[in-house]
Amino acid sequence: MAAFSEMGVMPEIAQAVEEMDWLLPTDIQAESIPLILGGGDVLMAAETGSGKTGAFSIPVIQIVYETLKDQQEGKKGKATIKTGASVLNKWQMNPYDRGSAFAIGSDGLCCQSREVKEWHGCRATKGLTKGKHYYEVSCHDQGLCRVGWSSMQASLDLGTDKFGFGFGGTGKKSHNKQFDNYGEEFTMHDTIGCYLDIDKGHVKFSKNGKDLGLAFEIPPHMKNQALFPACVLKNAELKFNFGEEEFKFPPKDGFVALSKAPESFVVKSQHTGSAQVAQTKFLPNAPKALIVEPSRELAEQTLNNVKQFKKYIDNPKLRELLIIGGVAARDQLSVLDNGVDIVVGTPGRLDDLVSTGKLNLSQVRFLVLDEADGLLSQGYSDFINRIHNQIPQITSDGKRLQVIVCSATLHSFDVKKLSEKIMHFPTWVDLKGEDSVPDTVHHVVVPVNPKTDRLWERLGKSHIRTDEVHAKDNTRPGANSPEMWSEAIKILKGEYAVRAIKEHKMDQAIIFCRTKIDCDNLEQYFMQQGGGPDKKGHQFSCVCLHGDRKPHERKQNLERFKKGDVRFLICTDVAARGIDIHGVPYVINVTLPDEKQNYVHRIGRVGRAERMGLAISLVATEKEKVWYHVCSSRGKGCYNTRLKEDGGCTIWYNEMQLLSEIEEHLNCTISQVEPDIKVPVDEFDGKVTYGQKRTLGGGNYKGHVDVLAPTVQELAALEKEAQTSFLHLGYLPNQLFRTF
């Protein structure tokens, strides 16, 4: 308790921490908690199981409590608010709502970006909520640009999310990253007219007075949102005309210039030249902290930690809410209406509630992105930027929004780019460094070579069910086609997984498969061996964890594995991201992950203090054809086995290349073992070894002593000689004096 109190943690939280047997803070907690309590933005990276959740939860809970306590006692902070009223009073491009390399002339109408690699955008100072309106844009050079309309929620990269409508110089219209042919190309000296009919919900454009026809119908979710003139440039220059000057091509059919729009139709931008300041009015659906997680399991795990840490906090009590998919929204809305202080959720459901106004972000003091690299890899960068833009940068009591980003690695380009965009001079707390394999983890590769191991030919129909990628192919023995070898690999991997379990008498292991259907097929094969979910204690008792299983089943399966009711957890990479499972003795990679960082996440699950951990990867020596769904259903009911480049949903998976990339990433050679999966035993301590990597990486005490023994003997001889010389020199002067 004293250790946490010394960092400034309040006694109530320290008491709860002590009951959890956390006697001392972990390294990541010791570094991060004081920084967050001090009001800073923090970027943190540490190993799974290092106490990372506590590192951000403890200070967030404390500051939220202190904020509520101040409000309860009527204390108010002072916020200095500047306004850009002079800018917002006229129609022009907004200098406070633009990209970092977007320049605006003194008239507010001439715009330029000379960045040649990145797009930079800008919105106008005013938007519209009603009526029929028009403005013109003239192209001053041959650079790339898109012009159009967007809401305040939209990204400045116009047309790449569901809140903006753009028309580009390449003759493409764009909305929600959908780029379709429209109209015709435009370039230097062309004038583009931008039409907006809010009453009908129509957006269209013209080129040099030529009407190009309807471009977009405004979707229902945007009917009540103000739309602002917007553009995005790459090495280009534009000049806007909102109607203060005479139009080159005046509009017809009742469209009026933006500058002539009635004041009742016009709204001013929220970007006013200083940080947006939160309103002081209490709202029950406006939390003080928002924690975003990439998966349901992680969100539930974090919420449980929050409940534990706040156990002794009272007057006022903190109210928390879990917002995830797969749960009735009405239950979550009911809790929101009664008031919440801390929200933990996943992007999908959070986005729904924020976009419909059910979840209000105007009071948020903390934005926490846990497993940020996972969120970005799942395509949630637009969501993150959108919610960050909606959160006031200054709270009603004058405090600054704090952003905390947790990531498995801070060496990801996407994470660095995100931090530069949404964080304010963040402190980096990197206790993980570049990826490496702990000394307690032995990892080996088992080559799966269907050309040398012909077992797959002799199994008949008793083998594992495969993923039906080759349902229409001739894969019978003798075909000697890539498809035949690919199907053989799938069959052999099922056999090798069973063989590994039997050979090492595995009592507990996590088994990673590449896809959800692979997980289901392996579970079914274990059931054929007599195991399965309902066979407690059986050699092949197992449960599955992946996105297609219902939330309550996923939660139940995770708990059953943790309690030891079943031996094996068969899962996709969802379990490799932060879920509180570590210290298992074995991991089996049925297929290598396509991201090398995920390999380290997977095998990092193994190892205990009293026994070394063993990670076995089954690596195909030939290419395997696998599912890679790019269809709208994301694989549900899809049987399109054509290759991705041919409009299908499959790819050829090259595990040997992936293995090479992993070895290069870790700067080591991973030892290979024979298909019998017998791993060599170290003579000194009886633990498994993984050969060359062990020798290179150190940690083998006996081998280390053998190597150093001759050097130590030589040093001992030199030491003896030096001391003898010193003694000889000490007596020599006395002997010389006596001779005289």
Curated annotation (Swiss-Prot):
Record key words, sorted: Acetylation, Activator, Antiviral defense, ATP-binding, Cytoplasm, DNA-binding, Exonuclease, Helicase, Hydrolase, Immunity, Innate immunity, Isopeptide bond, Mitochondrion, mRNA processing, Nuclease, Nucleotide-binding, Nucleus, Phosphoprotein, RNA-binding, Transcription, Transcription regulation, tRNA processing, Ubl conjugation
Domain spans labelled B30.2/SPRY: 70-247
Modified residue annotations for N6-acetyllysine: K239, K268, K281
Biological processes annotated in GO: defense response to virus; double-strand break repair; innate immune response; mRNA processing; positive regulation of canonical NF-kappaB signal transduction; rRNA processing; tRNA splicing, via endonucleolytic cleavage and ligation
UniProt keyword Disulfide bond present: no
Catalytic activity of the protein: ATP + H2O = ADP + phosphate + H(+)
Catalytic activity, EC: 3.6.4.13
One Pfam family matching this protein: Helicase_C
Taxonomy, superkingdom: Eukaryota
Top-rank EC class of the record's enzyme: hydrolase
Cross-link Glycyl lysine isopeptide (Lys-Gly) (interchain with G-Cter in SUMO2): where in chain: K281
Post-translational modifications: Phosphorylated by ATM kinase; phosphorylation is increased in response to ionizing radiation (IR).
Modified residues (Phosphoserine): S481
Cell compartment(s), UniProt: Nucleus; Cytoplasm; Cytoplasmic granule; Cytoplasm, Cytosol
Motif window: DEAD box: 370-373
Helicase C-terminal domain: residues covered: 493-681
Chain segments carrying region Interaction with dsRNA: 1-448
Region entry Necessary for interaction with HNRNPK, spans: 1-295, 525-740
Domain Helicase ATP-binding: 2-428
Positions with a binding annotation for ATP: A46, E47, T48, G49, S50, G51, K52, T53
Gene Ontology cellular component list: cleavage body; cytoplasm; cytoplasmic stress granule; cytosol; mitochondrion; nucleolus; nucleus; tRNA-splicing ligase complex
Note on domains (UniProt): The helicase domain is involved in the stimulation of RELA transcriptional activity.
Subunit description: Found in a multi-helicase-TICAM1 complex at least composed of DHX36, DDX1, DDX21 and TICAM1; this complex exists in resting cells with or without poly(I:C) RNA ligand stimulation. Interacts with DHX36. Interacts (via B30.2/SPRY domain) with DDX21 (via N-terminus); this interaction serves as bridges to TICAM1. Interacts with FAM98A (via N- and C-terminus). Interacts with PHF5A (via C-terminus). Interacts with MBNL1. Interacts with CSTF2. Interacts with HNRNPK. Interacts with ATM. Interacts with RELA (via C-terminus). Component of the tRNA-splicing ligase complex. Interacts with PQBP1.
Protein family membership: Belongs to the DEAD box helicase family. DDX1 subfamily.
Name under which the protein is recorded: ATP-dependent RNA helicase DDX1
